[in-house]
Amino acid sequence: MTNPMQFPDGFVFGGATAAYQVEGETRTHGKGKVPWDDFLAAQGRFSPDPASDFYNKYPVDIDLCQRFGINGIRVSIAWSRIFPSGTGEINPEGVAFYHELFATCNNAGVIPYVTLDHFDTPEAFYQNGGEGFLTRTTIDAFVEYAKFCFAEFTEVKHWFTFNEIPATAEGSFIVGNWPHGEKYRLDKAFQLMHNMMVAHAKAVVAFHEGGFEGEIGIVQNLEPKYPLAPNNAADCEAARMADVINNRWVLDATFRGHYAADTMEAATKLAHIAGGELDVRDEDIAALTAALPYNDCLGVNTYKCQFLRAAEGENDINHNGTGDKGSSRWFLKGVGESCVREGVPTTDWDWIIYPEGLYDLLLRIKNDYPNYKKIYITENGMGYKDDFEDGFIDDAPRIDYMRQHLAWILKAIDGGVNVDGYFVWSLQDQFSWTNGYNKRYGLFYIDFETQKRYPKASAYWYKNVAETGLLMA
C-alpha cells in the first residue's frame, strides 16, 4: 500500500506566475496595451510596473527554483507582447524574450507550463465597439494567436489556453471591479464564459490537428459551494445556483461538450434576472464537442470555498481589496448570500480557509466528469501580510495552509483522482490585480524598491517537500 504521505513518482512541485503580475515593462519593448494599463492608471492606487521585474530578473527566479527543488513553473505569454494590436504585425522582441525565457527554464530543469491568456487580452479588442470575448471575432483572433504560439514555441510541451474563465466573468460582469466592467450582469458573465470556452475548444482542436508535441488544457478557478444549512432545501438551491456560475458552466463545456439541461436552465434563469439572453449556437456546441477527446489536462486553481444561504433582496457585492477583515459582502439576486460557517477560519481578505473542500472538489470532478484525464493544481496559496525582520520572513500560517491542502490532495490521489502536480501561488511576491502589493503570496519575498529576493520560511519548507516527495505532519 502506498504511504499516504508519499507523493507519486514524477509529481511536479511547481511555482506559479503570470505575465502582467510579474514581468513589468508593460509599455516597453514593443508591447501593446491591455485594458489594465489605463484602468490602473486612472485608479492611481498602484502600478503594475515594475512588479517583480521578471522581464529582466527571470534568470534570478529560475535559479531560485533550481536551488529550492522547484521543477515546474507556470508562466504566461503576454498576447500583446507578441501581437501588439492583437492581430497582424508581430513584435520580434517579444518573441525573442519568450524563447530566451523558455530556454532558461528548460536548461535549468524547471519545466515551463505556459498559459496563452492570463487576464491580459489586448486592448485592441475593446476598441471600435469591441467588447473583448463578448465580440465573437475575438474568438477567431485568439485561435490564430494560439496557432502562432504552438508553431513558434515548440520547446513548450505543456500548454493552457486560458486562466480562470469564471474569475474573468466575475471581475468583468458580476463584481464589476475589472476594466470595462459592469456589476450584476449575469447574462454577460455566462456569455463571456461561453465564448471563451468556444475559443478554448477551437484552440485545442488546432493544437491536435497541427500534430504538436505535448499536452494542452485549461486552467479554471473552481470553488466548492456548500449550503450553510445542509438540511435546508433553500440553502441547497442557493449553493447549486452558485455552483453553476463558478463550476458547472465551464466543466460541462469542457467535459460534456454541451451544457446539461439543468445547467442551461439555471444559467438562462440568472441571465433573465439580469435582463438579458444567452446566445449559445449549434456551431458553438459542435466546437465544444469536437474538442472533447483532446482536453489533455485540467488546471485547478483553488484557494477557498463558499457557504451560501437562501435570501431575498437586491444585489449587493463589496470586494475586499484592502485586507480590512470583515468588509466583504456577497448577495446575488437569484442565488443567495455568502456566509461564514461558524468555526471556519478566514484570511484578512475574507477568503474562507477550508482545505477539505479541495478533496470534495477533486472527487466531484472524478465522479461527475469521468472522462477527465489528469489534473494539475495550478494555483494554491495564501495571501498574507508578511513581516520582514532582519532578512527573515516567518510565514508559518502559509506553511500550514499549504500543508493542509497538500494532505487533502494526497487523500484524493489515494481515492483514485489523477493529480500530477502542484503549483504554489506564487513563486515570488507579485503585483495583485485588485490588491496591489500589500497582499503577498510568494515563496520568495521581494523588496519592491530594490527587487532583491529573500526566501521565506515557506520556501525552505517547500524545498524539503519537493526534494523528498514526502509530506511531513
What are these regions (language model features)?
Residues T2-A42, S85-T87, V95-A473:
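Active-site region of glycoside hydrolase catalytic domains
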Residues E23-Y98:
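Active-site-adjacent substrate/metal-binding segments within catalytic domains
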